[in-house]
């Protein structure tokens, strides 16, 4: 059995297309849309094409003059097309936040603002194949039910065809929507269209409902809320008005009723303005606005001068190491001249002038801190003008001193500023070498007691007495704090010292302080030992007592870079 479809009347009927577009629009907007679609989907164009579908009868269940029931196999490969228009959300962050709970998602401001873009989609090249249960009745219309998913493929053309991933996403999303449409909404659309064609009662009832909607839309706009005066009107100055004054103003054509504002609304506007200047918890929410409390000008001025007590003070710090090494003949001390170069290697502490200041607002002071505990409570005097240190008591804490005869006359005005380059000078010997020096002094002292009668200058003897008070050859040299002293006349013994950045070390040997001859002899031996070490270093042919020391310290050391402010 075969059927002939008269497809041309459907193509020629303009009313049929209009009604079909309205039904498709309602069906597309009925189901929940994806969050990327932010507007209604509107069918702007519908064309069934010139090629009808193919039907193959599989089973006929009921056949009469006014009714028919059967199972068909339908296939369609025609030229029908459908055009849709809508608006989509182009900001993915906005789409993400819409689909997440507000308490579990961040709340950005302008970054989550919506950006809608109009979208036009054209669906064409439909490929349909499936089993259809068709029931026809003149009183009940046509009922079509698909037993399986009839949609095989279709072509989706949109505004974003140039963007590959957007095109693929739209293709996938629209195919899913159309599969649900064919299974759920299309049978209802076909049933309503059949009732409109064959059932006159349904056609009359539908026309009456359409006329009622048209009359309601043509009745005009609703009542203007601004045309009636407010409940508590006020004038431009904020004074309340009684009803009689409002009536007189309303009768006057020179004054408009819209100029009268409610007193409550003015209070709300004032509260809205004041809420921006306070820390109120009931600040009304405004889109894309961050609320921040205002501070007075006095607070702003004071905040510029305040400094956090935990904020560190950034200042240039340098590690200092001695560069000129010599054994002083009259003081028996090992001295070092300042040279801002390599790391300290364990013979002292770092000098941080900006770290020990009492206040950030005061002028920075440069001091040297003594980290050793004094053995007894003694008097330590120092002169801050020319870095002159002195000592009166033989049992006082050790101080840094040296003889000016073995150092250059260059003044170091700014000990914090590093030198331009490294200096190839002598360095401090290791602890092992200092022990050997002390042992050599003791050996020479036992064998040459006759040389203790040599005369020494008074200043050298005084310096030697101070240096020999603490016999600790293995002690690590440390800096001592310089206390300001204005009384120079009270200093009996003075010795010119290095700048504050230099570090000196004084190796000593155990001495019997009660024997002055022994002290004189020790000072003589120390000077002789220092002279021999200098000669051995200068003369390459001679035998050197400390070959490892001279080899290790003859290499040039590269200074570290200076710290920036």
UniProtKB/Swiss-Prot annotation:
InterPro entries: Mdm34 (IPR027536), SMP_LBD (IPR031468). Keywords: Lipid transport, Lipid-binding, Membrane, Mitochondrion, Mitochondrion outer membrane, Transmembrane, Transmembrane beta strand, Transport. GO terms for molecular function: lipid binding. It is found in: Mitochondrion outer membrane. It is a multi-pass membrane protein. Coiled coil: none annotated. Residues 1-208 form the SMP-LTD domain. Residues 382-391 have a biased composition (Low complexity). GO terms for cellular component: ERMES complex. Residues 368-378 have a biased composition (Basic and acidic residues). Its main location: mitochondrion. Residues 209-241, 347-463, 533-565 are annotated as: Disordered. Component of the ER-mitochondria encounter structure (ERMES) or MDM complex, composed of mmm1, mdm10, mdm12 and mdm34. Component of the ERMES/MDM complex, which serves as a molecular tether to connect the endoplasmic reticulum (ER) and mitochondria. Components of this complex are involved in the control of mitochondrial shape and protein biogenesis, and function in nonvesicular lipid trafficking between the ER and mitochondria. Mdm34 is required for the interaction of the ER-resident membrane protein mmm1 and the outer mitochondrial membrane-resident beta-barrel protein mdm10. HAMAP family: Mdm34 (MF_03105). Lacks alpha-helical transmembrane segments, suggesting that it resides in the membrane via beta-sheet conformations similar to those predicted for other outer membrane proteins and porin. This is Mitochondrial distribution and morphology protein 34. The lineage of its organism: Eukaryota, Fungi, Dikarya, Ascomycota, Pezizomycotina.
């Amino acid at each position: 059995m075969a059927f002939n479809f008269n497809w041309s009347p459907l193509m020629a009927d303009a009313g049929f297309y209009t009604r079909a577009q309205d039904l498709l629009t309602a069906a597309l907007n009925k189901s929940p849309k994806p969050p990327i679609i932010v507007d209604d989907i509107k069918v702007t164009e519908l064309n069934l094409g010139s090629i009808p579908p193919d039907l193959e009868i599989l089973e006929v269940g009921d056949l009469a003059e006014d009714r028919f029931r059967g199972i068909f196999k339908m296939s369609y490969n025609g030229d029908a097309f459908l055009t849709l228009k809508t608006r989509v959300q182009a900001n993915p962050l906005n789409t993400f936040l819409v689909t997440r709970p507000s308490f579990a998602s961040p709340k950005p401001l302008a970054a989550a603002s919506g950006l809608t873009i109009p979208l036009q989609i054209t669906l064409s090249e439909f490929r349909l194949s499936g089993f259809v249960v068709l029931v026809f009745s003149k009183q009940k219309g046509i009922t079509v039910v698909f037993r399986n998913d009839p949609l095989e493929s279709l072509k989706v053309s949109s505004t974003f065809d140039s963007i590959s991933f957007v095109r693929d996403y739209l293709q996938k999303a629209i195919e899913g929507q159309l599969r649900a449409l064919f299974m759920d909404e299309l049978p209802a659309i076909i049933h309503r269209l059949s009732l409109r064609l064959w059932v006159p009662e349904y056609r009359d009832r539908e026309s009456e409902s359409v006329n009622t909607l048209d009359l309601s839309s043509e009745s005009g706009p609703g009542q203007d809320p601004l045309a009636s005066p407010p409940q508590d009107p006020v004038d431009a100055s904020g004074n309340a008005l009684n009803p009689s004054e409002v009536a007189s103003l309303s009768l006057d054509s020179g004054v408009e009723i819209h100029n009268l504002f409610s007193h409550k609304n003015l209070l709300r506007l004032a509260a809205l303005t004041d809420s921006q200047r306070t820390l109120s918890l009931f600040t009304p929410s405004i889109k894309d606005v961050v609320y921040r409390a205002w501070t007075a000008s006095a607070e702003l001025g004071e905040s510029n001068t305040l400094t956090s007590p935990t904020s560190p003070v950034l200042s240039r710090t340098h590690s200092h190491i001695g560069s000129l090494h010599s054994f002083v003949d009259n003081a028996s001390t090992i001295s070092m001249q300042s040279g801002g170069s390599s790391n300290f290697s364990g013979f002292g502490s770092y000098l941080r002038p900006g770290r020990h200041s009492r206040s950030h607002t005061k002028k920075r002071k440069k001091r040297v801190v003594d980290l050793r505990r004094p053995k007894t409570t003694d008097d330590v005097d120092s002169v801050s003008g020319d870095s002159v240190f002195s000592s009166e008591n033989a049992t006082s804490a050790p101080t840094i001193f040296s003889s000016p005869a073995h150092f250059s006359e260059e003044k170091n005005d700014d000990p914090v500023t590093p030198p331009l380059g490294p200096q190839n000078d002598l360095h401090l010997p290791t602890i092992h070498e200092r022990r050997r020096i002390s042992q050599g002094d003791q050996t020479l002292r036992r064998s040459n007691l006759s040389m203790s009668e040599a005369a020494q200058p008074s200043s050298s003897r005084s310096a030697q007495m101070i240096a020999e008070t603490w016999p600790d050859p293995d002690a690590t040299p440390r800096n001592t704090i310089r206390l300001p002293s204005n009384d120079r006349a009270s200093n009996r013994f003075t010795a010119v010292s290095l700048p504050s950045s230099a570090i000196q070390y004084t190796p000593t040997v155990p001495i019997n302080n009660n024997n002055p001859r022994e002290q004189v002899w020790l000072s003589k031996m120390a000077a002789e030992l220092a002279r021999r070490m200098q000669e051995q270093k200068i003369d390459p042919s001679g035998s050197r007592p400390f070959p490892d020391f001279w080899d290790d310290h003859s290499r040039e050391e590269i200074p570290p870079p200076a710290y920036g402010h």
